[in-house]
């Protein structure tokens, strides 16, 4: 089993709670079995934006410090960007440059994952303090520009079916992305923010989606190594998960209630 856990925010807070330097805390995690770290909580690596959207999280320098230290200790990590809220293309460029410069020093990023902001149930979106996410054109450009800006230092640009749905990821795979986000089992974060693309995409569905745009799928490990034919076959024949009963996001519940009221009134 591969353990992929602890964002830079969680590492920073964990080290502070125990009164340890970040490096010592990371070495403890490595000693007890942690394999890789997610490069989440990055949002936008620019403190102009972070002061607005996540003032209670780590700042840009702290995020970069945790990731660089993790790479030095021997971990590989992902890198993300969450865009389309109060940010601008200038902030996106700064973010990409900071990721690229760190990768040049450490080589520890395995992939870059653009994550379009989902506004429907996000606090900023509910309060009307942000955009309603990026445009689809901006989403496609982010994947394409990331490919150009980060090449050859980060070779895998991942697109998220949870955020974009099947048609969205097809478009991104044809314009910059070369990696499709994981199968997952019980995705909850994006759903809580308002997405409705489901909680799981089985391997067979992922391969069919990739083949539909005349690409050849290749399963990989979390660390971007190869996967044996036996493991691949077991994944393709695994039983479906038990269907989950999902509570619709608040906005969808309000819309359903309103539609029901209109229907009853019409009768």
Question: Each predicted region: which residue ranges?
Answer:
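Conserved SAM/AdoMet-binding glycine-rich loop
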Residues: 1-67, 71-78, 85, 107, ...
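Active-site-proximal loop/turn and secondary-structure-junction residues that shape catalytic pockets
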Residues: 7-12, 41-44, 81-87, 116-120, ...
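Catalytic cores of alpha/beta
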Residues: 20-26, 86-100, 163-175
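Conserved, mostly hydrophobic/aromatic
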Residues: 37-40, 70, 99, 146, ...
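Short hydrophobic alpha-helical runs that function as membrane-insertion/retention elements
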Residues: 38, 78-80, 179-183
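Aromatic-anchored, glycine/proline-accented short structural segments
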Residues: 70-114
